[in-house]
């Protein structure tokens, strides 16, 4: 029996190409529609030509500056925004059209604060009902009691907390607990740990890693907080201007930079900021503005080198392209393998 458990856990090691496909994004393009339900004339896509595939056991860290498109991508994956059915598949089904994914808990999205709409006012307020944490958590039906008890312990929840008196961090713990009660297969996290203290956050990340390694779940986690994340993700996705800039296993990212993960991402964002400043200057001077990062780069193969020597957001100082990475004709599409 013990040997069977070991084989089961190892079968969900992150990065295995033979693991089941959990998330597949193919040439995703998205623009928020106008009041007529159509994209405004002349509008540029907010998300454009975005493709990646995640397998069972993958833990993907989604990074990028404010406004890069991270939340929009997660909402599309969570079935909250409609795109063509074949653009986004969760376990082979359309994230938006197959409502059974979310109703069953197989696909779970956690992001933002608990809020409710104010009728006719056009805005929302945080949920602060006079109700206990126990009633909220135990009010979710169809839950494995052992899983519920483990989550209460991991998140250090006091069941006597009253939601109208609880702190932001305490309410956040209850929100996360309720979102994880059902055994998800794909979990989308949008800056969900922002209110948690260091201890609870560390215990939660450990629990989520176990979910991937033991049950074969896949997680995409967007955050700007890097405490405890140095070795947590299996893959890094860097997004800028709604486009995929980099998608690599964590070991490959570490090979490209000798800095910490946080400092590496900081370098990408600083270079992106500098590129944005240069574009604005060129535009103000009446010069042409480069549209994309890698399209005009003569550098091929290694994605890190493309980001380095091309006119690109996310340049890494630790990589330099050699003569073997150049080609006579321009390479417009770059395929990044796992």
Residue ranges and their predicted role:
Residues 191-192:
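Walker B catalytic motif
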């Amino acid at each position: 029996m013990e040997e069977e458990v070991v084989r089961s856990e190892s079968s969900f090691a992150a990065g295995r190409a033979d693991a089941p496909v959990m998330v597949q994004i193919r040439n995703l393009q998205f623009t928020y529609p106008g009041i007529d339900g159509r994209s405004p004339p002349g509008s540029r896509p907010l998300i454009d030509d975005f493709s990646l595939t995640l397998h069972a056991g993958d833990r993907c860290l989604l990074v990028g500056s404010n406004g890069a498109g991270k939340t929009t991508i997660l909402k599309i994956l969570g079935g909250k925004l409609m795109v063509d059915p074949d653009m986004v598949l969760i376990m082979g089904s359309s994230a938006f059209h197959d409502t059974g994914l979310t109703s069953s808990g197989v696909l779970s999205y956690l992001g933002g604060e608990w809020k409710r709409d104010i009728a006719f006012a056009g805005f929302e307020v945080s949920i602060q009902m006079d109700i206990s944490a126990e009633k909220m958590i135990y009010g979710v039906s169809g839950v494995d009691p052992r899983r519920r008890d483990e989550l209460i312990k991991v998140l250090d929840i006091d069941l006597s907390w009253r939601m109208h008196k609880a702190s932001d961090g305490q309410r956040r713990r209850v929100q996360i607990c309720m979102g994880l009660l059902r055994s998800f297969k794909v979990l989308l996290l949008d800056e969900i740990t922002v209110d948690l203290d260091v201890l609870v956050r560390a215990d939660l990340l450990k629990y989520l890693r176990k979910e991937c390694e033991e049950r074969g779940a896949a997680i995409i986690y967007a955050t700007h907080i890097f405490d405890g994340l140095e070795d947590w993700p299996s893959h890094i996705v860097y997004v800028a201007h709604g486009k995929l800039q980099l998608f690599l296993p964590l070991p490959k990212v570490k090979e490209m930079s000798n800095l910490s993960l946080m400092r590496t991402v900081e370098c990408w964002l600083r270079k992106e900021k500098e590129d944005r400043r240069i574009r604005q200057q060129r535009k103000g001077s009446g010069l042409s503005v480069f549209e994309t990062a890698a399209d005009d780069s003569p550098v091929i193969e290694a994605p890190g080198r493309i980001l380095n020597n091309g006119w690109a957001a996310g340049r890494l100082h630790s990589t330099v392209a050699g003569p073997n990475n150049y080609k006579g004709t321009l390479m417009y599409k770059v395929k990044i393998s796992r």
